[in-house]
Amino acid sequence: MIGLDTNVLARYYVANADAPGKRQSLAAKQLLESGKRLLVSKTVVLELEWVLRGYYKSLPAEVQAVYAHLLSLPNVEVEDRPAVELAVAALAQGFDFADALHHASYRQCTSVATFDTRSFARRAQAAGWKPRVDLLKDSAI
């Protein structure tokens, strides 16, 4: 089995105009489509979303399409696939991918504690996500 780094997946999914980028894209395509057993870690999944969204300015629907394709490849194993699938579904609902992946990774817990005030806790509760998301308050020590 071969573990894939984020840059291999980025080169596979994003067209590059320069000569080195084209060569790397071809090498990535050959590897991913070779039938060899490949592994994508959860951290690479998370970093890929950041690269697609942050660097390449991909829209959420484009990121979802990348993950739908990646998850459909029979020779690619994705670490904690159920968590990744939940996070991709949450992205489709407008949730932040990283927040959703963190939450999905804690599915065996009774709750998730956060200081995140960007409404993640409220939205997760409204969506009925389990485990519940608890917003911690600052405390004076």
Predicted region positions:
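Short, well-structured N-terminal submotif of metal-dependent ribonuclease cores
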Residues: 1-40, 55-62, 127-141
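Acidic, PIN/NYN-like endoribonuclease modules and their adjacent C-terminal/linker elements
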Residues: 107-141
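Active-site neighborhoods of divalent-metal-dependent phosphate/nucleic-acid chemistry enzymes
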Residues: 73-118
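Active-site flanking residues adjacent to catalytic metal/cofactor-binding acidic residues
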Residues: 4, 46, 115
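Active-site-proximal, substrate-binding regions of enzyme catalytic domains
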Residues: 29, 43, 47-75, 82
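Active-site phosphate/pyrophosphate-handling residues
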Residues: 7, 26, 43, 49, ...
